[in-house]
Amino acid sequence: EIELEVMTCPKMVYVKQKDDFLTTDELDANDRVENISGTALRQALQHRHALPDWFSFPEIIQTLQTAYPPKHEQGFTLFFTGLSGSGKSTLAKAVQAKLSEANTRTVTLLDGDVIRKNLSAGLGFSKKDRDINVKRLGYVASEITKHRGIAICASIAPYVEARRFVRKQVEQYGGFIEIYVATPFDVCKSRDIKGLYQQAEEGVITGFTGVDDPYEAPEQPELVIDTSQMTIPEALEVIFHGLQQLGFYENNCATYVSQRHASKKQVQFVAENMTDII
């Protein structure tokens, strides 16, 4: 027996015409109660809408605004995935250059080949090793995102489950925008100056994605780009228009993609499926 008495705290509400907080038991029939739901609060913070003075102390509101910045101030990860030769790295470098012009957030390019050399040395190309490599890439991207930077990943990342793991890891801290570079196999093969596709087809090398190892196409990517159907500048317009639509990029001088460049076959927006990151 420790003789503790449980104390209850009555629910308090703000009554506008009385400019006071009352318990629900003290309300009159004609009292007008003001209320902000959790969803409304998140939306107000996300869009930098002013919160009413009665909601909280100014210092607390300022702390909330600092802790939950709008999307265009949050960190996010752009994750380019596709076959070898699809144009992932070229697009990633072009996006990095354009984002760096804004100079509002740190932009870091994480190229798959560089990650393999520096973080995944010793790993092979079995499914297990490839998944480990992609998850390491995702961890670095999540740390960049957590500190409100922009991570740009360019990796074949052939398996859905590993990419899903990375998405979940990153979305703890910010946005995750998966960009499927869906350039056709024959086009990718024609761009292969090293002849790796031919060697894989001849059996000289094994475990090559798209030949004797599967590439599992993304199920619901935020963007789909086919570099055989558009130039790099056109693809950039699609990507940055997508970032604006999703709320992660603000630039009043940005060129909006034309209807000709944004056919359904070239780009698919699934912003409605984005996880609420606040």
Where are these regions (language model features)?
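Active-site cores that bind ATP or allylic diphosphates and position pyrophosphate for catalysis
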Residues: 1-74
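Small-molecule kinase domains that catalyze NTP-dependent phosphoryl transfer to phosphate-bearing small molecules
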Residues: 15, 182-185, 190-238, 246-269, ...
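Hydrophobic anchor at the beta1->P-loop junction of P-loop NTPases
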Residues: 80
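P-loop (Walker A) phosphate-binding loop of NTP-binding proteins
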Residues: 83
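ATP-binding Walker
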Residues: 86
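Walker A/P-loop
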Residues: 89
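Conserved substrate/cofactor phosphate-moiety recognition/catalytic segment
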Residues: 93-142, 146
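ATP-dependent NMP and nucleoside kinases share a basic, alpha-helical "lid"
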Residues: 118-124, 141-201, 207
